Amino acid sequence: RFNFKLPGENPADAGLTFTAIPTIQWAYESGASSSDALNWGAILAVSKAYSKDLTLGIGAGIFREIDDTKAFPVVLVDWRINDRLRLANPTQAGPAGGAGLELAWTLDDRWEIAGGGAWRTHRFRLDRNGPTPDGIGERKSIPLMLRATWRPAPASRLDLYAGVAVGGELTVHDRDGNELVSQDFDPAPLLGITFQARF
């Protein structure tokens, strides 16, 4: 998978901020044609700062994903409930779906714990030499995640993730987009680690 995003924001009067995030993505298996695996579209949203602790917004995502067009609502939340508790979007909305919600608790200057989830769907082109030549695979799930963040310095952070993907469904379409088979899959464990540093 290859992604290209060009986010932009335009602050306006009355405390409104308009956001546009155009995205181009190629999603395909090894052996599939990249020219038939283009996903493209944009997130458009408007948000308003009601106070220094609360920003809310709404918008929509519209994407063309390998012979299928989908649209979904986008809800933007950044609510600092108190000095330690915050409800916000953990990820940026994109072709896979909205930004989800995460509740984070700041323990001290170095540690933060959080939990949240999102709805995710991915379409990708299948191997031209596979059981369904040039077909389309689609995976849907609801990832539920726990996060622990350690900040060893003000400009760096280490994130540890553990969770489970529930409500999973895998669908296979032929090259013309006709559904061939759809099957639920068992909850799958999720683990991740990221490190960020600014210099």
PLM features: residue spans?
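Residue-level signature of outer-membrane beta-barrel architecture
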Residues: 6-10, 44, 48, 79, ...
